[in-house]
Amino acid sequence: MEMEKEENVVYGPLPFYPIEEGSAGIQLHKYMHQYAKLGAIAFSNALTGVDISYQEYFDITCRLAEAMKNFGMKPEEHIALCSENCEEFFIPVLAGLYIGVAVAPTNEIYTLRELNHSLGIAQPTIVFSSRKGLPKVLEVQKTVTCIKKIVILDSKVNFGGHDCMETFIKKHVELGFQPSSFVPIDVKNRKQHVALLMNSSGSTGLPKGVRITHEGAVTRFSHAKDPIYGNQVSPGTAILTVVPFHHGFGMFTTLGYFACGYRVVMLTKFDEELFLRTLQDYKCTSVILVPTLFAILNKSELIDKFDLSNLTEIASGGAPLAKEVGEAVARRFNLPGVRQGYGLTETTSAFIITPEGDDKPGASGKVVPLFKVKVIDLDTKKTLGVNRRGEICVKGPSLMLGYSNNPEATRETIDEEGWLHTGDIGYYDEDEHFFIVDRLKSLIKYKGYQVPPAELESVLLQHPNIFDAGVAGVPDPDAGELPGAVVVMEKGKTMTEKEIVDYVNSQVVNHKRLRGGVRFVDEVPKGLTGKIDAKVIREILKKPQAKM
Protein backbone atom coordinates (compact mmCIF):
# COMPACT_ATOMS: atom_id res chain seq x y z
CA MET A 1 0.00 0.00 0.00
CA GLU A 2 1.44 3.38 -1.03
CA MET A 3 2.10 5.83 1.79
CA GLU A 4 0.00 8.98 1.78
CA LYS A 5 2.05 11.92 0.55
CA GLU A 6 2.45 14.96 2.76
CA GLU A 7 1.10 18.27 1.52
CA ASN A 8 3.66 20.66 0.02
CA VAL A 9 6.38 18.00 0.09
CA VAL A 10 8.02 17.16 -3.24
CA TYR A 11 8.80 13.47 -3.79
CA GLY A 12 11.36 11.93 -6.12
CA PRO A 13 10.40 9.08 -8.47
CA LEU A 14 10.98 5.39 -7.91
CA PRO A 15 14.52 4.30 -8.83
CA PHE A 16 15.07 2.85 -12.30
CA TYR A 17 17.41 0.26 -10.80
CA PRO A 18 16.61 -1.30 -7.41
CA ILE A 19 19.17 -0.72 -4.68
CA GLU A 20 21.50 -3.72 -4.75
CA GLU A 21 22.27 -5.94 -1.78
CA GLY A 22 25.53 -5.72 0.13
CA SER A 23 27.87 -3.03 1.38
CA ALA A 24 29.41 -0.30 -0.75
CA GLY A 25 32.61 -2.36 -0.74
CA ILE A 26 30.87 -5.50 -2.00
CA GLN A 27 29.21 -3.59 -4.81
CA LEU A 28 32.36 -1.73 -5.89
CA HIS A 29 34.35 -4.98 -5.79
CA LYS A 30 31.74 -6.53 -8.09
CA TYR A 31 31.84 -3.56 -10.49
CA MET A 32 35.64 -3.60 -10.64
CA HIS A 33 35.69 -7.32 -11.39
CA GLN A 34 32.91 -7.00 -13.97
CA TYR A 35 34.62 -4.22 -15.95
CA ALA A 36 38.05 -5.82 -15.57
CA LYS A 37 36.80 -8.79 -17.57
CA LEU A 38 35.80 -6.39 -20.36
CA GLY A 39 39.28 -4.87 -20.57
CA ALA A 40 38.05 -1.35 -19.81
CA ILE A 41 40.30 1.51 -18.65
CA ALA A 42 39.42 2.87 -15.21
CA PHE A 43 41.66 5.90 -14.87
CA SER A 44 43.64 8.18 -17.19
CA ASN A 45 45.91 11.00 -16.09
CA ALA A 46 45.75 13.45 -18.99
CA LEU A 47 48.78 15.36 -17.70
CA THR A 48 51.12 12.33 -17.60
CA GLY A 49 49.42 10.04 -20.11
CA VAL A 50 49.24 7.23 -17.54
CA ASP A 51 46.33 4.77 -17.93
CA ILE A 52 45.18 2.26 -15.30
CA SER A 53 42.83 -0.50 -16.41
CA TYR A 54 39.95 -1.86 -14.35
CA GLN A 55 41.95 -5.11 -14.14
CA GLU A 56 44.93 -3.29 -12.61
CA TYR A 57 42.65 -1.37 -10.24
CA PHE A 58 40.87 -4.58 -9.25
CA ASP A 59 44.16 -6.37 -8.57
CA ILE A 60 45.81 -3.65 -6.50
CA THR A 61 42.68 -2.76 -4.49
CA CYS A 62 42.20 -6.43 -3.56
CA ARG A 63 45.88 -6.79 -2.64
CA LEU A 64 45.83 -3.62 -0.54
CA ALA A 65 42.61 -4.70 1.19
CA GLU A 66 44.21 -8.05 2.04
CA ALA A 67 47.33 -6.26 3.31
CA MET A 68 45.32 -3.94 5.58
CA LYS A 69 43.32 -6.88 6.91
CA ASN A 70 46.53 -8.78 7.69
CA PHE A 71 48.01 -5.62 9.23
CA GLY A 72 45.19 -5.93 11.76
CA MET A 73 42.61 -3.43 10.52
CA LYS A 74 39.11 -4.08 11.87
CA PRO A 75 35.78 -2.81 10.43
CA GLU A 76 35.33 -0.32 13.29
CA GLU A 77 38.67 1.37 12.54
CA HIS A 78 39.50 4.25 10.20
CA ILE A 79 42.08 4.99 7.53
CA ALA A 80 42.79 8.46 6.13
CA LEU A 81 44.18 9.99 2.96
CA CYS A 82 46.19 13.19 2.69
CA SER A 83 46.76 13.80 -0.99
CA GLU A 84 46.13 15.98 -3.98
CA ASN A 85 44.29 14.38 -6.92
CA CYS A 86 46.29 11.50 -8.37
CA GLU A 87 45.52 8.23 -10.16
CA GLU A 88 46.24 6.27 -6.96
CA PHE A 89 43.79 8.27 -4.81
CA PHE A 90 40.90 5.82 -4.99
CA ILE A 91 43.00 2.67 -4.39
CA PRO A 92 42.92 2.94 -0.56
CA VAL A 93 39.34 4.26 -0.74
CA LEU A 94 38.11 1.11 -2.49
CA ALA A 95 40.35 -1.20 -0.45
CA GLY A 96 39.07 0.31 2.79
CA LEU A 97 35.46 -0.09 1.70
CA TYR A 98 36.16 -3.73 0.74
CA ILE A 99 37.05 -4.55 4.36
CA GLY A 100 34.47 -2.29 6.02
CA VAL A 101 36.82 0.32 7.50
CA ALA A 102 35.79 3.97 7.30
CA VAL A 103 37.80 6.14 4.93
CA ALA A 104 38.59 9.79 5.77
CA PRO A 105 39.91 11.75 2.75
CA THR A 106 41.79 15.03 3.18
CA ASN A 107 43.93 17.15 0.86
CA GLU A 108 47.62 18.00 1.12
CA ILE A 109 46.82 21.71 0.74
CA TYR A 110 45.19 21.70 4.19
CA THR A 111 47.05 23.89 6.65
CA LEU A 112 48.69 22.08 9.54
CA ARG A 113 45.91 23.35 11.82
CA GLU A 114 43.19 22.04 9.48
CA LEU A 115 44.86 18.67 8.97
CA ASN A 116 45.45 18.23 12.69
CA HIS A 117 41.77 18.99 13.28
CA SER A 118 40.52 16.61 10.55
CA LEU A 119 42.77 13.69 11.46
CA GLY A 120 42.01 14.30 15.12
CA ILE A 121 38.34 13.69 14.33
CA ALA A 122 39.05 10.69 12.09
CA GLN A 123 41.49 8.95 14.47
CA PRO A 124 42.99 6.85 11.65
CA THR A 125 45.18 3.79 12.16
CA ILE A 126 46.82 4.20 8.75
CA VAL A 127 47.32 7.39 6.73
CA PHE A 128 47.95 7.15 2.99
CA SER A 129 49.87 10.30 2.14
CA SER A 130 51.24 11.80 -1.04
CA ARG A 131 54.86 12.88 -0.99
CA LYS A 132 53.69 16.50 -0.78
CA GLY A 133 51.51 15.78 2.21
CA LEU A 134 54.07 13.77 4.19
CA PRO A 135 55.72 16.62 6.18
CA LYS A 136 52.35 17.75 7.56
CA VAL A 137 51.21 14.18 8.31
CA LEU A 138 54.44 13.55 10.25
CA GLU A 139 53.84 16.71 12.26
CA VAL A 140 50.22 15.75 12.98
CA GLN A 141 51.29 12.25 14.05
CA LYS A 142 53.00 13.82 17.08
CA THR A 143 49.60 14.75 18.52
CA VAL A 144 47.25 12.29 16.78
CA THR A 145 49.03 9.30 18.25
CA CYS A 146 46.58 6.66 16.99
CA ILE A 147 48.36 6.81 13.61
CA LYS A 148 50.37 3.58 13.55
CA LYS A 149 51.44 3.60 9.93
CA ILE A 150 52.05 6.09 7.12
CA VAL A 151 52.03 4.71 3.57
CA ILE A 152 53.21 6.77 0.59
CA LEU A 153 50.40 6.87 -1.94
CA ASP A 154 51.96 8.32 -5.10
CA SER A 155 55.37 6.64 -5.26
CA LYS A 156 56.57 3.31 -6.66
CA VAL A 157 59.47 3.28 -4.18
CA ASN A 158 59.77 3.99 -0.47
CA PHE A 159 59.98 7.67 0.36
CA GLY A 160 61.16 9.60 3.40
CA GLY A 161 61.70 6.40 5.36
CA HIS A 162 58.11 5.25 4.80
CA ASP A 163 56.74 2.34 2.80
CA CYS A 164 55.18 2.95 -0.57
CA MET A 165 51.96 1.02 -1.25
CA GLU A 166 53.74 -1.81 -3.04
CA THR A 167 56.18 -2.33 -0.16
CA PHE A 168 53.33 -2.27 2.37
CA ILE A 169 51.46 -4.87 0.32
CA LYS A 170 54.51 -7.14 -0.01
CA LYS A 171 55.09 -7.01 3.75
CA HIS A 172 51.53 -8.02 4.63
CA VAL A 173 50.32 -10.27 1.81
CA GLU A 174 51.44 -13.86 1.43
CA LEU A 175 53.46 -14.75 -1.66
CA GLY A 176 51.19 -16.29 -4.25
CA PHE A 177 48.05 -14.45 -3.12
CA GLN A 178 45.59 -14.15 -6.01
CA PRO A 179 43.39 -11.02 -6.12
CA SER A 180 40.59 -13.11 -7.62
CA SER A 181 40.44 -15.09 -4.36
CA PHE A 182 39.77 -12.01 -2.21
CA VAL A 183 36.30 -11.82 -0.67
CA PRO A 184 35.12 -8.39 0.54
CA ILE A 185 33.55 -8.06 3.97
CA ASP A 186 29.86 -7.24 4.29
CA VAL A 187 28.72 -4.95 7.10
CA LYS A 188 26.08 -5.93 9.65
CA ASN A 189 23.90 -2.86 9.13
CA ARG A 190 24.72 -0.62 6.20
CA LYS A 191 22.30 2.07 7.45
CA GLN A 192 24.45 2.47 10.57
CA HIS A 193 27.93 1.45 9.38
CA VAL A 194 30.13 4.40 8.38
CA ALA A 195 31.74 4.09 4.94
CA LEU A 196 33.35 7.52 4.64
CA LEU A 197 34.17 10.29 7.06
CA MET A 198 34.06 13.40 4.90
CA ASN A 199 34.86 16.97 5.89
CA SER A 200 32.03 19.51 5.90
CA SER A 201 32.55 22.70 3.92
CA GLY A 202 33.90 24.51 6.97
CA SER A 203 32.09 27.69 5.91
CA THR A 204 31.25 28.47 9.53
CA GLY A 205 34.55 27.41 11.10
CA LEU A 206 36.76 24.33 11.06
CA PRO A 207 35.23 21.39 9.15
CA LYS A 208 33.10 18.83 10.94
CA GLY A 209 33.43 15.09 10.34
CA VAL A 210 30.45 13.98 8.23
CA ARG A 211 29.62 10.29 8.73
CA ILE A 212 28.43 8.81 5.42
CA THR A 213 26.95 5.32 5.62
CA HIS A 214 27.16 2.35 3.25
CA GLU A 215 23.42 2.85 2.65
CA GLY A 216 24.10 6.37 1.46
CA ALA A 217 26.89 5.25 -0.85
CA VAL A 218 24.96 2.41 -2.52
CA THR A 219 21.96 4.68 -3.06
CA ARG A 220 24.29 6.97 -5.01
CA PHE A 221 25.38 4.07 -7.21
CA SER A 222 21.72 3.60 -8.18
CA HIS A 223 21.42 7.29 -9.11
CA ALA A 224 24.69 7.16 -11.05
CA LYS A 225 23.32 4.46 -13.36
CA ASP A 226 19.82 5.93 -13.75
CA PRO A 227 18.99 6.72 -17.41
CA ILE A 228 16.65 9.52 -16.28
CA TYR A 229 19.87 11.55 -15.88
CA GLY A 230 21.28 10.47 -19.23
CA ASN A 231 23.48 7.87 -17.51
CA GLN A 232 24.09 4.32 -18.58
CA VAL A 233 26.38 1.41 -17.80
CA SER A 234 28.84 1.98 -20.61
CA PRO A 235 32.39 0.69 -20.02
CA GLY A 236 34.99 2.81 -21.76
CA THR A 237 32.95 6.02 -21.95
CA ALA A 238 35.37 8.84 -21.13
CA ILE A 239 34.39 11.42 -18.49
CA LEU A 240 36.69 14.34 -17.69
CA THR A 241 36.93 15.62 -14.12
CA VAL A 242 38.90 18.42 -12.50
CA VAL A 243 37.00 18.25 -9.20
CA PRO A 244 38.93 17.66 -5.91
CA PHE A 245 38.61 13.98 -4.97
CA HIS A 246 38.75 14.61 -1.21
CA HIS A 247 35.57 16.70 -1.45
CA GLY A 248 32.16 15.01 -1.31
CA PHE A 249 31.33 16.20 -4.82
CA GLY A 250 34.45 14.64 -6.36
CA MET A 251 34.34 11.53 -4.18
CA PHE A 252 30.79 10.44 -4.95
CA THR A 253 30.71 11.38 -8.62
CA THR A 254 33.87 9.33 -9.17
CA LEU A 255 32.58 6.31 -7.25
CA GLY A 256 29.43 6.61 -9.38
CA TYR A 257 31.57 6.58 -12.52
CA PHE A 258 33.16 3.32 -11.35
CA ALA A 259 29.66 1.87 -10.91
CA CYS A 260 29.04 2.59 -14.61
CA GLY A 261 32.43 1.40 -15.86
CA TYR A 262 33.42 4.82 -17.14
CA ARG A 263 36.95 5.86 -17.95
CA VAL A 264 37.73 8.65 -15.49
CA VAL A 265 40.02 11.15 -17.21
CA MET A 266 41.73 13.34 -14.64
CA LEU A 267 43.46 16.70 -14.88
CA THR A 268 45.47 17.51 -11.76
CA LYS A 269 45.41 21.20 -12.63
CA PHE A 270 43.28 23.37 -14.90
CA ASP A 271 44.97 24.75 -17.98
CA GLU A 272 42.57 26.08 -20.60
CA GLU A 273 44.34 24.68 -23.67
CA LEU A 274 45.18 21.33 -22.02
CA PHE A 275 41.58 21.04 -20.81
CA LEU A 276 40.16 21.50 -24.32
CA ARG A 277 42.80 19.24 -25.87
CA THR A 278 41.96 16.52 -23.34
CA LEU A 279 38.26 16.73 -24.22
CA GLN A 280 39.22 16.30 -27.87
CA ASP A 281 41.94 13.63 -27.62
CA TYR A 282 40.13 11.37 -25.13
CA LYS A 283 36.80 11.87 -26.94
CA CYS A 284 35.15 12.77 -23.63
CA THR A 285 31.36 12.70 -23.69
CA SER A 286 30.91 14.55 -20.40
CA VAL A 287 32.84 16.89 -18.15
CA ILE A 288 32.15 17.87 -14.58
CA LEU A 289 33.26 21.31 -13.40
CA VAL A 290 33.06 23.67 -10.47
CA PRO A 291 31.55 27.13 -11.21
CA THR A 292 34.91 28.92 -11.02
CA LEU A 293 35.95 27.34 -14.32
CA PHE A 294 32.77 28.34 -16.16
CA ALA A 295 33.80 32.01 -16.10
CA ILE A 296 37.12 31.10 -17.76
CA LEU A 297 35.46 28.97 -20.45
CA ASN A 298 32.86 31.65 -21.10
CA LYS A 299 35.64 34.02 -22.21
CA SER A 300 37.78 31.37 -23.96
CA GLU A 301 39.13 32.16 -27.42
CA LEU A 302 40.35 28.58 -27.93
CA ILE A 303 37.13 26.52 -27.96
CA ASP A 304 36.62 26.71 -31.73
CA LYS A 305 40.14 25.36 -32.37
CA PHE A 306 39.27 21.88 -31.06
CA ASP A 307 36.97 19.08 -32.20
CA LEU A 308 34.58 18.67 -29.29
CA SER A 309 31.88 16.84 -31.22
CA ASN A 310 31.88 13.93 -28.75
CA LEU A 311 30.95 16.19 -25.84
CA THR A 312 27.26 15.79 -25.05
CA GLU A 313 27.14 17.16 -21.50
CA ILE A 314 28.70 19.70 -19.17
CA ALA A 315 27.76 19.29 -15.52
CA SER A 316 28.18 21.78 -12.70
CA GLY A 317 28.25 21.28 -8.96
CA GLY A 318 30.00 22.12 -5.71
CA ALA A 319 28.65 25.69 -5.60
CA PRO A 320 25.90 27.79 -7.23
CA LEU A 321 26.37 28.58 -10.93
CA ALA A 322 25.04 31.89 -12.24
CA LYS A 323 22.24 31.27 -14.74
CA GLU A 324 23.68 33.65 -17.35
CA VAL A 325 27.16 32.10 -17.15
CA GLY A 326 25.80 28.57 -17.50
CA GLU A 327 23.71 29.50 -20.53
CA ALA A 328 26.63 31.29 -22.18
CA VAL A 329 29.01 28.34 -21.73
CA ALA A 330 26.40 25.90 -23.05
CA ARG A 331 26.11 28.02 -26.19
CA ARG A 332 29.89 28.07 -26.62
CA PHE A 333 29.93 24.25 -26.63
CA ASN A 334 26.78 23.95 -28.79
CA LEU A 335 24.90 22.20 -26.00
CA PRO A 336 21.26 22.73 -24.97
CA GLY A 337 22.21 23.53 -21.37
CA VAL A 338 24.36 22.71 -18.35
CA ARG A 339 23.33 19.77 -16.18
CA GLN A 340 22.95 21.15 -12.69
CA GLY A 341 22.61 19.48 -9.36
CA TYR A 342 22.29 20.49 -5.74
CA GLY A 343 23.37 18.69 -2.63
CA LEU A 344 25.62 18.77 0.40
CA THR A 345 28.38 16.62 1.81
CA GLU A 346 25.82 15.81 4.52
CA THR A 347 23.44 14.33 1.91
CA THR A 348 26.13 12.25 0.16
CA SER A 349 26.19 14.62 -2.81
CA ALA A 350 23.21 15.72 -4.92
CA PHE A 351 19.57 15.10 -4.03
CA ILE A 352 18.33 17.47 -6.73
CA ILE A 353 19.53 16.78 -10.30
CA THR A 354 18.42 17.92 -13.74
CA PRO A 355 16.72 15.03 -15.58
CA GLU A 356 17.63 14.36 -19.20
CA GLY A 357 15.74 16.75 -21.49
CA ASP A 358 13.93 18.47 -18.62
CA ASP A 359 16.11 21.43 -17.73
CA LYS A 360 15.05 24.98 -16.98
CA PRO A 361 17.34 28.02 -17.05
CA GLY A 362 18.50 28.79 -13.51
CA ALA A 363 17.02 25.63 -11.99
CA SER A 364 19.11 23.02 -10.18
CA GLY A 365 16.82 20.16 -11.18
CA LYS A 366 14.27 17.85 -9.57
CA VAL A 367 14.24 15.59 -6.53
CA VAL A 368 16.09 12.29 -7.10
CA PRO A 369 14.60 8.82 -6.47
CA LEU A 370 13.92 7.82 -2.84
CA PHE A 371 14.18 11.40 -1.55
CA LYS A 372 11.62 14.00 -0.53
CA VAL A 373 12.14 17.74 -0.11
CA LYS A 374 10.20 20.59 1.44
CA VAL A 375 10.66 24.35 1.83
CA ILE A 376 9.95 25.90 5.23
CA ASP A 377 9.30 29.46 6.36
CA LEU A 378 12.39 30.96 7.99
CA ASP A 379 10.45 32.27 10.97
CA THR A 380 7.42 30.03 11.53
CA LYS A 381 9.08 26.82 10.19
CA LYS A 382 5.79 25.98 8.44
CA THR A 383 5.96 24.10 5.15
CA LEU A 384 5.54 26.39 2.14
CA GLY A 385 3.97 25.78 -1.27
CA VAL A 386 4.90 26.52 -4.87
CA ASN A 387 7.10 29.58 -5.59
CA ARG A 388 7.49 30.44 -1.89
CA ARG A 389 11.05 31.06 -0.74
CA GLY A 390 12.33 29.43 2.42
CA GLU A 391 14.86 26.97 3.79
CA ILE A 392 15.24 23.71 1.88
CA CYS A 393 14.90 20.55 4.00
CA VAL A 394 15.44 16.98 2.82
CA LYS A 395 14.82 13.36 3.82
CA GLY A 396 16.30 10.29 2.16
CA PRO A 397 18.50 7.20 2.56
CA SER A 398 21.73 9.06 1.83
CA LEU A 399 21.54 11.52 4.72
CA MET A 400 24.60 11.45 6.96
CA LEU A 401 24.48 9.46 10.15
CA GLY A 402 25.53 12.65 11.91
CA TYR A 403 28.64 14.68 12.70
CA SER A 404 31.42 12.69 14.34
CA ASN A 405 31.55 13.30 18.10
CA ASN A 406 29.38 16.39 17.71
CA PRO A 407 25.80 15.60 18.82
CA GLU A 408 24.94 19.28 19.28
CA ALA A 409 25.76 20.16 15.66
CA THR A 410 23.92 17.03 14.52
CA ARG A 411 20.76 18.08 16.41
CA GLU A 412 21.00 21.56 14.87
CA THR A 413 21.10 20.06 11.38
CA ILE A 414 18.74 17.05 11.56
CA ASP A 415 15.49 17.66 13.43
CA GLU A 416 13.46 15.19 15.52
CA GLU A 417 11.42 14.12 12.48
CA GLY A 418 14.54 13.25 10.49
CA TRP A 419 14.54 16.28 8.18
CA LEU A 420 17.98 17.64 7.36
CA HIS A 421 17.98 21.44 7.29
CA THR A 422 20.33 22.52 4.50
CA GLY A 423 20.79 26.13 5.52
CA ASP A 424 20.08 27.13 1.91
CA ILE A 425 17.29 29.35 0.63
CA GLY A 426 15.29 28.22 -2.37
CA TYR A 427 11.90 27.42 -3.86
CA TYR A 428 10.24 25.11 -6.37
CA ASP A 429 7.90 25.94 -9.24
CA GLU A 430 4.73 24.36 -10.62
CA ASP A 431 6.78 21.69 -12.42
CA GLU A 432 8.72 20.82 -9.23
CA HIS A 433 11.97 22.30 -10.51
CA PHE A 434 14.04 23.63 -7.61
CA PHE A 435 15.83 26.96 -7.63
CA ILE A 436 18.58 27.71 -5.10
CA VAL A 437 18.65 31.37 -4.11
CA ASP A 438 21.44 31.62 -1.55
CA ARG A 439 22.99 30.30 1.63
CA LEU A 440 20.92 31.19 4.70
CA LYS A 441 24.02 32.26 6.60
CA SER A 442 25.19 34.31 3.60
CA LEU A 443 22.06 36.49 3.51
CA ILE A 444 22.90 40.13 4.11
CA LYS A 445 20.65 41.70 6.75
CA TYR A 446 20.04 45.33 5.76
CA LYS A 447 17.56 47.22 7.97
CA GLY A 448 15.46 44.09 8.45
CA TYR A 449 15.57 43.16 4.76
CA GLN A 450 17.27 39.97 3.58
CA VAL A 451 19.56 40.50 0.59
CA PRO A 452 20.82 37.40 -1.29
CA PRO A 453 24.45 37.94 -2.41
CA ALA A 454 23.98 35.55 -5.35
CA GLU A 455 21.41 37.90 -6.91
CA LEU A 456 23.81 40.84 -6.84
CA GLU A 457 26.65 38.64 -8.13
CA SER A 458 24.47 37.63 -11.05
CA VAL A 459 23.76 41.28 -11.88
CA LEU A 460 27.48 42.11 -11.77
CA LEU A 461 28.43 39.17 -13.99
CA GLN A 462 26.02 40.35 -16.68
CA HIS A 463 28.14 43.47 -17.25
CA PRO A 464 30.48 42.89 -20.23
CA ASN A 465 33.41 44.62 -18.50
CA ILE A 466 33.28 42.44 -15.36
CA PHE A 467 35.01 39.04 -15.40
CA ASP A 468 34.09 37.83 -11.89
CA ALA A 469 32.50 39.15 -8.71
CA GLY A 470 31.64 38.27 -5.14
CA VAL A 471 29.27 39.95 -2.69
CA ALA A 472 29.13 40.03 1.11
CA GLY A 473 27.74 42.17 3.91
CA VAL A 474 29.83 44.87 5.59
CA PRO A 475 28.95 45.46 9.28
CA ASP A 476 27.21 48.79 9.87
CA PRO A 477 26.05 50.14 13.26
CA ASP A 478 22.86 51.68 11.88
CA ALA A 479 21.74 49.31 9.10
CA GLY A 480 23.18 46.04 10.40
CA GLU A 481 24.98 45.15 7.16
CA LEU A 482 25.61 46.91 3.85
CA PRO A 483 25.89 44.94 0.60
CA GLY A 484 29.37 45.32 -0.91
CA ALA A 485 31.24 43.68 -3.78
CA VAL A 486 34.71 42.62 -4.88
CA VAL A 487 35.18 42.72 -8.64
CA VAL A 488 37.65 41.32 -11.17
CA MET A 489 37.67 43.35 -14.38
CA GLU A 490 37.99 41.91 -17.87
CA LYS A 491 41.48 42.31 -19.35
CA GLY A 492 41.89 45.76 -20.80
CA LYS A 493 38.63 47.04 -19.29
CA THR A 494 38.25 49.63 -16.54
CA MET A 495 35.38 51.06 -14.54
CA THR A 496 35.21 53.31 -11.53
CA GLU A 497 33.65 52.24 -8.26
CA LYS A 498 30.85 54.74 -8.86
CA GLU A 499 30.13 53.34 -12.33
CA ILE A 500 29.75 49.82 -10.92
CA VAL A 501 27.61 50.98 -7.99
CA ASP A 502 25.38 53.01 -10.31
CA TYR A 503 25.02 50.04 -12.68
CA VAL A 504 23.96 47.64 -9.93
CA ASN A 505 21.69 50.16 -8.23
CA SER A 506 19.85 50.70 -11.51
CA GLN A 507 19.04 46.97 -11.64
CA VAL A 508 17.80 46.30 -8.09
CA VAL A 509 15.33 47.57 -5.50
CA ASN A 510 16.43 50.13 -2.93
CA HIS A 511 17.40 47.76 -0.08
CA LYS A 512 19.68 45.68 -2.36
CA ARG A 513 21.85 48.60 -3.47
CA LEU A 514 25.65 48.36 -3.12
CA ARG A 515 25.96 50.66 -0.12
CA GLY A 516 29.01 48.72 1.11
CA GLY A 517 31.06 49.83 -1.87
CA VAL A 518 33.24 48.00 -4.39
CA ARG A 519 36.82 46.74 -4.16
CA PHE A 520 38.87 45.77 -7.21
CA VAL A 521 40.76 42.49 -6.80
CA ASP A 522 42.85 40.16 -8.96
CA GLU A 523 40.83 37.14 -7.90
CA VAL A 524 37.55 36.56 -6.06
CA PRO A 525 38.26 34.55 -2.88
CA LYS A 526 36.82 31.05 -3.32
CA GLY A 527 37.17 27.57 -1.89
CA LEU A 528 38.29 24.47 -3.79
CA THR A 529 34.83 23.80 -5.18
CA GLY A 530 34.24 27.36 -6.31
CA LYS A 531 32.19 28.53 -3.33
CA ILE A 532 32.69 32.22 -2.70
CA ASP A 533 34.41 32.90 0.63
CA ALA A 534 32.21 35.59 2.16
CA LYS A 535 34.41 35.89 5.26
CA VAL A 536 37.45 36.92 3.23
CA ILE A 537 35.38 39.27 1.06
CA ARG A 538 33.98 40.92 4.19
CA GLU A 539 37.52 41.61 5.43
CA ILE A 540 38.52 43.07 2.04
CA LEU A 541 35.49 45.35 2.07
CA LYS A 542 36.34 46.63 5.55
CA LYS A 543 39.64 48.00 4.25
CA PRO A 544 39.85 51.29 2.34
CA GLN A 545 40.09 51.05 -1.44
CA ALA A 546 43.68 50.99 -2.66
CA LYS A 547 44.52 53.71 -5.17
CA MET A 548 44.56 52.46 -8.76
UniProtKB/Swiss-Prot annotation:
Function: Produces green light with a wavelength of 570 nm.
Record keyword Nucleotide-binding present: yes
Chief location of this protein within or outside the cell: other
Subunit structure: Homodimer.
UniProt EC number: 1.13.12.7
Keywords: ATP-binding, Luminescence, Magnesium, Metal-binding, Monooxygenase, Nucleotide-binding, Oxidoreductase, Peroxisome, Photoprotein
InterPro entries per the UniProt record, alphabetical: AMP-bd_C (IPR025110), AMP-bd_C_sf (IPR045851), AMP-binding_CS (IPR020845), AMP-dep_synth/lig_dom (IPR000873)
Cofactor(s) needed for function: Mg(2+)
Protein name per Swiss-Prot or TrEMBL: Luciferin 4-monooxygenase
Pfam families cross-referenced by the UniProt entry: AMP-binding, AMP-binding_C
Segments carrying motif Microbody targeting signal: 546-548
Activity regulation remarks: Inhibited by ATP analogs and sodium deoxycholate. Activated by choline-containing phospholipids.
Protein species of origin: Luciola mingrelica (Southern Russian firefly)
